[in-house]
């Protein structure tokens, strides 16, 4: 059954405007750098091609093909620019209707699967994060906007010939404590998590239509140790810690004493330690890192791991009314902080919108909000892998 045409959702492709859908889903998430869409409809274009002698007048719209550039607007507000990635169709037994579904990704989708610099260069000197990302994104027709401090230039930044565009940029961004996010329409954003507020709160008895929640300890730990090694006299800075000995007291963070004499050639082993007071039983974990000049300390990294693990340990999904909220009727968007009241999941405070899904179907318009703890996407200046290891890996 075809629902009445909704002028609120419009797909622009091949010089046509389509707004007659059975189902629409548009998704953006901090977990996936590019947004995606899925639309189901009666494919009048292919039906006309199949039954050309029987169809009159011409169909409402022509057939959509994979690879076509497209854009999607909600209430005439552009929210998605990208490409049709796949078209699937099914014809009924009587040959009277062809049901089709098209899916695709936004303009940043090609950054996930395509090479960063197929023809070189593979190494840059004294380049900023913004310049590096712009150099990679420019051939794809994608802009870059810095919305936060991107830090100092990299003295040397190298990638492998086979490195994909997005992983290469993310590796560099982590060294500057920056989060990469697609705006869905034109640009890759260099930003921080939760820098803006959502248009409204999320609350039972107010706008929530249901809930699913997860509160997990599976990847949370009572004690997080970060161990790294400074460069020694022999230039070794591979991040390999010296043999570990038991701490004097579990959970105290007491690190084994290091002998400057014995470690002189290989470097000094450094240990950071942070605790999560919400984890009430002994659950220790050790993370190994490189420690180099200019990067965060092992103690800062230990505290950061605890914050991120805590934020990702809470996950809630809320369908809410419509796509818009608040006095300005603004769209719900990812990477915004929102006040959340959910007595069922025992939440009463700020949460971060990890993802949004705009839906339109026989039940009308709604948004599914994916919320996580506000610290889930915190960033910290992570140390770079040594050039020595990088070069060995790319030989």
Language-model segments: which ranges?
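Polar/acidic, low-complexity leader/linker segments enriched in S/T/G and N/D
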Residues: 1-30
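An acidic/polar, Gly/Ser/Thr-rich interaction patch typically located in mid-to-C-terminal regions
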Residues: 26-63, 206-395
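Short beta-strand and beta-hairpin "edge-sheet" elements
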Residues: 19, 71-104, 181-183, 338-370
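Extracytoplasmic
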Residues: 6, 21, 34-36, 79, ...
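Structural motif
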Residues: 13, 74-75, 204-206
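Amphipathic, non-transmembrane alpha-helical segments in extracytoplasmic/periplasmic proteins
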Residues: 33, 37-39, 84, 104, ...
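Short beta-strand-centered interaction patches in the first periplasmic/extracellular domains
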Residues: 2, 79, 88-111, 146-221
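Surface-exposed cap/loop segments at beta↔alpha junctions
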Residues: 2, 53-144
């Amino acid at each position: 059954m075809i629902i009445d045409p909704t002028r609120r959702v419009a797909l622009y492709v091949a010089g046509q405007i389509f707004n007659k859908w059975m189902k629409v889903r548009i998704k953006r998430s901090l977990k996936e750098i590019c947004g995606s869409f899925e639309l189901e409809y009666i494919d009048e274009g292919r039906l006309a091609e199949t039954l050309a002698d029987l169809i009159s007048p011409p169909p409402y719209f022509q057939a959509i093909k994979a690879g076509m550039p497209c854009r999607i607007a909600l209430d005439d507000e552009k929210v998605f620019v990208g490409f049709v990635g796949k078209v699937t169709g099914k014809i009924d037994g009587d040959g009277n209707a062809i049901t089709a579904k098209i899916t695709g990704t936004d303009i940043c989708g090609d950054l996930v699967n395509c090479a960063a610099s197929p023809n070189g260069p593979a190494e840059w000197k004294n380049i900023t994060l913004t310049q590096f990302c712009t150099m990679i994104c420019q051939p794809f027709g994608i802009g870059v906007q810095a919305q936060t401090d991107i830090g100092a230039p990299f003295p040397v930044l190298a990638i492998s010939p086979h490195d994909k565009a997005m992983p290469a940029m993310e590796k560099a961004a982590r060294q500057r404590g920056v989060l990469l996010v697609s705006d869905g329409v034109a640009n890759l954003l260099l930003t921080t998590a939760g820098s803006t507020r959502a248009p409204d709160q999320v609350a039972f008895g107010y706008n929530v239509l249901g809930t699913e929640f997860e509160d997990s300890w599976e990847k949370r730990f009572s004690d997080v140790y970060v161990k790294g090694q400074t460069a020694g006299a022999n230039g070794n800075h591979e991040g390999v810690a010296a043999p570990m000995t038991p701490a004097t007291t579990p959970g105290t963070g007491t690190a084994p004493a290091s002998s400057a004499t014995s470690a002189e050639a290989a470097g000094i082993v450094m240990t950071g330690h942070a605790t999560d007071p919400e984890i009430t039983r002994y659950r220790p974990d050790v993370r190994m890192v490189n420690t180099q000049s200019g990067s965060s300390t092992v103690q800062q990294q230990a505290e950061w791991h605890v914050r991120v693990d805590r934020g990702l340990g809470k996950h809630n999904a809320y369908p809410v009314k419509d796509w818009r909220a608040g006095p300005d009727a603004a769209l719900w968007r990812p990477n915004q902080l929102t006040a959340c009241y959910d007595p069922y999941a025992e939440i009463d405070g700020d949460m971060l919108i990890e993802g949004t899904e705009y839906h339109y179907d026989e039940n009308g318009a709604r948004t599914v909000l994916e919320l996580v703890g506000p610290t889930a996407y915190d960033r910290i200046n992570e140390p770079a892998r040594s050039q020595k290891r990088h070069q060995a890996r790319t030989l």
